[in-house]
From Swiss-Prot:
One of its GO terms (biological process) is glycolytic process. CDD domains: enolase. The lineage of its organism: Bacteria, Pseudomonadati, Thermodesulfobacteriota, Desulfovibrionia, Desulfovibrionales. Its EC number is 4.2.1.11. GO terms for cellular component: cell surface; extracellular region; phosphopyruvate hydratase complex. (2R)-2-phosphoglycerate binds at residues 163, 337, 366-367, 388. The gene is eno. The keyword Ribonucleoprotein does not apply. It is an enzyme of class 4 (lyase). Gene3D superfamilies: Enolase-like C-terminal domain (3.20.20.120), Enolase-like, N-terminal domain (3.30.390.10). It is found in: Cytoplasm; Secreted; Cell surface. It catalyses: (2R)-2-phosphoglycerate = phosphoenolpyruvate + H2O. Its cofactor is Mg(2+). It comes from Oleidesulfovibrio alaskensis (strain ATCC BAA-1058 / DSM 17464 / G20). This is Enolase. The keyword Magnesium applies.
Length: 431
């Protein structure tokens, strides 16, 4: 009854108006599952490859008809008849069928759509919420949201080099209260920026994208917004950034155009450390470029005891690369993006490896998103404790937050919000 009987795909649009793949997997029982695949703007060079058509006369070359054809042709031919409850077998069949290291034959976008839709179909067949099907009876931790409220870098047309400035409502007692705090801070920030004559248009992930004098000014605006909303920076709301340093790393140096600085790896680390000493900044993602392995090691040694050092481009959700990082002392946390690796099974393998090594995990969206909220369920399924899914506007971001509200309601008293644990770990609010 849980046998896959059909696999269908279509080309839809993501939050940037670019094509992406949506897949539907149907079972003999009549149950089905649907999944849409996200896409990134700042990408790691070793990510699994999303297949694009390259026809400049159609969607400027970004069409995904080839990936759709692969799903409905070769992939469907090979997985129809398989049991949707055997996720590992389905994903291994996809991997073997593609036969490449970076999934560039069938396309990671084609493969991931099938993988996630299969999991949804299986959950629907059993009659379980997706988070519980994926994680089991102990899935109960509601994640701390990393809310991106000021955008820069590749996500916004402004003069900020750091790609994301985020707030983390660690002092909230529940996820729903954390979401309320974030929304209030977001609206207060908008008012503060507008009062000073700044444009309040938003970037790809829903954060504001003002032209500011410096990165320091961005931090100061956020601190003011937290206080204006009636909260205490540090004990109630911590800060996080995604530097996306690979985007401004050239010839072995970090070129900060907004600051008019060219820094060595050590100088870049010192520049970031200065922010952690003056603001309640507890998490830094991609503070070093993916190719600056020695810089990553130095940063981890200097800051790893007091700051969450998150690897995104450097690890690309790949268990083999993560294993090397663990062995060589690179980072203490990993960002998890499903489409960087291309199947659900490989994603879960990476998370297990990270947790086994004592690394924290942050489940993440991409800058090109859809209304699909799979990652909200995944964050709870894995008890990850943290989720990064954008700002407090744009429905593609809010879809994930709203799903977490539903999950919190479903868990009722059994649900645990991770914020107080993070606050305790980082000593926030201590004298």
């Amino acid at each position: 009854m849980s046998t896959i009987v059909s696999v269908w795909a279509r080309e839809i649009l993501d939050s940037r108006g670019n094509p992406t793949v949506e897949v539907e997997v149907s079972l003999e029982s009549g149950h089905s599952g649907r999944a849409a695949v996200p896409s990134g703007a700042s990408t790691g060079s070793r990510e699994a490859l999303e297949l694009r058509d390259g026809d400049k006369g159609r969607y400027l070359g970004k069409g995904v008809e080839k990936a759709v054809d692969n799903v409905m042709g070769e992939i469907a031919e090979n997985i129809v008849g398989m049991d949707a409850l055997r996720q590992v077998a389905v994903d291994n069949a996809l991997i073997d069928l593609d036969g490449t290291d970076n999934k560039d034959r069938l396309g990671a976008n084609a493969m991931l759509g099938v993988s996630l839709a299969t999991a949804r179909a299986a959950a629907n067949f059993i009659g379980m919420p997706l988070y519980q099907y994926l994680g089991g009876i102990n899935s109960k931790v509601l994640p701390v949201p990393m809310m991106n409220i000021i955008n820069g870098g590749e996500h916004a047309p402004n003069n900020l080099d750091i790609q994301e400035f985020m707030i983390m409502p660690v002092g909230a007692p529940t996820f729903s209260e954390a979401l309320r705090m974030g929304a209030e801070i977001f609206h207060n920030l908008k008012a503060l920026l507008a009062a000073d004559g700044h444009v309040t248009s938003v970037g790809d992930e829903g954060g504001f994208a003002p032209n500011l004098k410096s990165h320091d000014e961005a931090f100061r605006y956020i601190m003011r917004a937290i206080e204006t909303a009636g909260y205490i920076p540090g004990s109630e709301v911590a800060l996080a950034i995604d530097a996306a340093a690979s985007e401004f790393y050239k010839d072995g140096k970090y070129h900060l155009k907004g600051e008019n600085k060219v820094l060595s790896s050590s100088e870049m680390i010192d520049w970031l450390m200065d922010f952690t000493q003056r603001y309640p900044l507890i998490s830094i993602e991609d503070g070093m470029a993916e190719g600056d392995w020695e810089g990553w090691q130095e940063m981890t040694v200097k800051m790893g005891d007091s700051v969450q050092i998150v690897g995104d481009d450097v690890f690309v959700t790949n268990p083999d690369i993560l294993a090397q990082g663990i062995d060589e002392g690179v980072a203490n946390s990993i960002l998890i993006k499903l489409n960087q690796i291309g199947t659900l099974t490989e994603t879960l393998d990476t998370v297990e490896m990270a947790k086994g090594a004592g690394y924290t995990t942050v489940i993440s969206h991409r800058s090109g998103e859809t209304e699909d909220h799979f990652i909200a369920d995944l964050a709870v399924a894995l008890n990850a404790g943290q989720i990064k899914t954008g700002s407090l506007c744009r429905s593609d971001r809010l879809a994930k937050y709203n799903q977490l509200l539903r999950i919190e309601e479903d868990l009722d008293d059994e649900g645990i919000y991770f914020g107080p644990y993070m606050a305790s770990h980082f000593g926030l609010g201590e004298e």
